[in-house]
């Protein structure tokens, strides 16, 4: 899922997301949208889908990760989290009930439960306390969700989030507890936050041994092309990450043959297509030399081209993975492309 934190996927028009990238769902963030433009504006607009012109499915993160990253300006209790806005310093309180109400107002097709996202280096004692707090909040989230109705004429789903840091017994317990809610789908959170790649892969395996195979399984905030294939191999169905657009704006382009730094002088007189294997028009319309020139000149068009390319590549990656799953040869295909994905060109 392309990430549209504040209601927009950076440097990309909604029409380009649909036609060039081929995205079917995007992500918005409750914390940021609550602070700006605010729920009054979104309610008056008829929900985020109408406000931003996307018009398609949206998943809203609960904002928990963002709130807990404000280590110097937030205070946590069993009731919820008090924090100060990064915009103007104003004071706010997020409780599970309040977050459910905000996500109803935003209008995401898929809503995420309010959780605590501890760092990947948290010790076992803190991980235990954090998990218990998250599970208590989850009960309150579902109670509020099931006692309220959608506002914009379509159904909304609520996904619980499995936490537990890198402790297998906590992850397994969390997975067993969340499936009691018989939700429409389940998320795996708290990974790619400082733990090792091996720990991340192990936690995905532990959780997916428990989560039902007939419901979507969403790995939050991951990751590189290799991470995505590793996750798919372990049973993950959905992912989001800011890497395609963030790295694109920093001149890093992902391709089937490896990654390109478009600021490198080696592309100065390379007039071949940006990516002969790419699926978007920018890959055919522009040359490596031209895109390198745009970055050197700090032209805004560089950010747009790179973001479209990377997002289109990521969507091509997962669609190709799906094709090989259906053909029954995913493992051999993954082995044939895996190393190239991390090569520096």
Please give the residue ranges for each predicted region:
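C-terminal extensions of enzymes
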Residues: 115-121, 275-345
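Non-catalytic, usually N-terminal nucleic-acid engagement modules in DNA/RNA processing proteins
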Residues: 1-151, 265-268
